[in-house]
A protein has these predicted regions:
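Basic nucleic-acid-binding interfaces
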Residues: 1-123
Length: 123
């Protein structure tokens, strides 16, 4: 999920709180949060999704609730919102560890590549 306008609004001081909050949203929807991590302008959310849950519904709830959380806490000046849309990918059980490591090492990864390059490679 990307911040609206790709602005660098997710600050180090509160990003871990945001990640925990998003993991709580996922757990509250009875899904499995594997890892949440990201950069100042976007986040990656790795979820074990049950077949009964539509990814679009879960992403909508994550975006709505996390935007409200950020705005209520006044983490940013003005109004925070996520960009429209999202990218969703499915992975096999054998890929869980490599996807987890990829998301865990976002800061290191982005020292080498920009988000656009990263996203195009995932497609």
């Amino acid at each position: 999920m990307a911040v609206k306008g790709r602005e660098n609004l997710i600050a180090k001081q509160w990003k871990h709180g945001l990640h925990k909050y998003i993991a709580g949203i996922i757990k509250g929807k009875e899904q499995k949060s594997i890892i949440v991590n990201g950069m100042p302008d976007h986040i990656h959310v790795f979820i074990g999704l049950k077949p009964s849950m539509a990814i679009s519904d879960l992403v909508r709830d994550i975006k709505n609730n996390s935007s409200n959380f950020i705005n209520e806490k006044k983490f940013v000046k003005g109004r925070f919102s996520w960009q429209e849309g999202y990218g969703a990918f499915s992975y096999g059980h054998s890929q869980i560890e490599s996807v987890y490591d990829y998301i865990l090492k976002q800061e290191e990864h982005h020292k080498k590549r920009m988000f656009r390059e990263e996203y195009l490679d995932l497609l």
